[in-house]
A protein has these predicted regions:
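A beta-rich soluble binding module of mature secreted/lumenal proteins
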Residues: 2, 19-175
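Bacterial Sec-type N-terminal signal peptides, specifically the leucine/valine-rich hydrophobic h-region
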Residues: 14-17
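Bacterial N-terminal signal peptides that target proteins for export
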Residues: 1-9
Length: 175
């Protein structure tokens, strides 16, 4: 009985972790993705709320290459209540090859989640629409702290069409 229970728990754990690195239904990662052009600083413009970003302003992400072929992810946000910056460092690896905007990302040991780029300004990589493993994760990232109205409108329209709850978007303040 103990072996059966242990086996079940192992299968359940693998299934749960596998689900954390999936793609939401209806979402397609961008193709012809260029990791080199994606590197550098990004500003978080809008998002759906999650505990790890709750109450933060001035949120940025920096992507750089790792020696093992992955990307280093450095997220920062300012916690005004505590008067301090919160920083999280992670790593990301391509899930469908280097030319698709779909990565597994980890900020904690062997546990990975999804990072799915479903729209991207392919001319100059000026903005990026990103989700996670399910539709409770949604971000609009930009190379600048503000985006033109047409980019924000495109983001909201596309996210709505894909089934994201854009009424719950939080717009990030940048100084």
């Amino acid at each position: 009985m103990h072996k059966v229970l242990h086996g079940f728990l192992m299968v359940a754990a693998v299934a749960i972790l596998a689900g954390c690195a999936g793609i939401p239904k209806g979402v397609t990662p961008v193709k012809n993705f260029d990791t080199q052009r994606y590197l550098g600083d990004w500003y978080e413009i809008a998002r759906l709320e999650h505990s790890f970003e709750k109450g933060l302003s001035d949120i940025t992400a920096n992507y750089s290459l790792r020696d093992d072929g992955g990307m280093r992810v450095l997220n920062r946000g300012y916690d005004a209540k505590k008067g301090e910056w919160r920083v999280a460092e992670g790593k990301a690896y391509p899930m469908e090859g280097p030319n698709t905007g779909y990565f597994k990302v980890s900020f904690f040991g062997p546990f990975y989640g999804s990072y799915v780029i479903f729209d991207l300004d392919k001319t100059d990589y000026g903005y990026s629409f990103v989700t996670g493993a399910d539709k409770s994760y949604l971000w609009l990232l930009s190379r600048t702290p503000r985006v033109p109205d047409e980019v924000l409108s495109k983001f909201i329209k596309k996210a709505n069409q894909l089934g994201f709850d854009t009424d719950k978007l939080i717009y990030v303040k940048h100084k």
